[in-house]
A protein has these predicted regions:
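Short acidic-aromatic low-complexity motifs
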Residues: 14-18
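Vicinal oxygen chelate
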Residues: 1-11, 21-121, 131-140
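C-terminal catalytic core of tyrosine-transesterase DNA break-rejoin enzymes
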Residues: 124
Length: 140
């Protein structure tokens, strides 16, 4: 049997990952997939959230091998990457994110390549881009 196609999954680190796990569900509409906590419940060792057929992974910042390689936005004074979520209902998604406390960095707008996008920042500084453009399909 052939192996499944490779998947690209974004992995993010948070100072308060247990809180952000719930916040991402509230603000962006992710669904819980998996969460593994430390015995005291203060550290999210590994979390997975699903949206459609896509996933993100997140966890608490720790001083381990991976943690030494990956920084949080607050440690960098910004971020070097941002997840892009291809979806419909951009205006409604923007309002949902705003109500949950996201900082809206770019209000919904139509782009010259046929997408409608907005950009926001979560409470710990990760930048999220939402748009109707789907890279697997030609732009209109």
């Amino acid at each position: 049997m052939p192996s499944p196609e490779p998947m690209i999954i974004v992995s993010l680190r948070y100072a308060d990952a247990p809180r952000m796990y719930d916040w991402l569900i509230e603000a962006f509409g992710f669904e819980k997939h998996a969460a593994y906590y430390s015995e005291d419940g203060k550290t999210l060792l590994h979390g997975e959230l699903r949206m459609g057929s896509s996933f993100i992974m997140l966890g608490s910042s720790e001083n381990n091998e991976f943690g030494k390689l990956v920084s949080r936005p607050a440690e960098l004074g910004g971020t070097t990457a941002s997840p892009y979520i291809a979806t419909d209902d951009i205006d409604a998604r923007c309002e949902r994110a705003r109500k949950a406390g996201a900082e809206i960095c770019m209000e919904p707008r139509d782009q010259p390549y046929g997408s409608r996008d907005f950009i926001c920042m979560d409470p710990e500084g990760h930048v999220w881009c939402f748009g109707t453009y789907r890279p697997a399909q030609p732009a209109t």
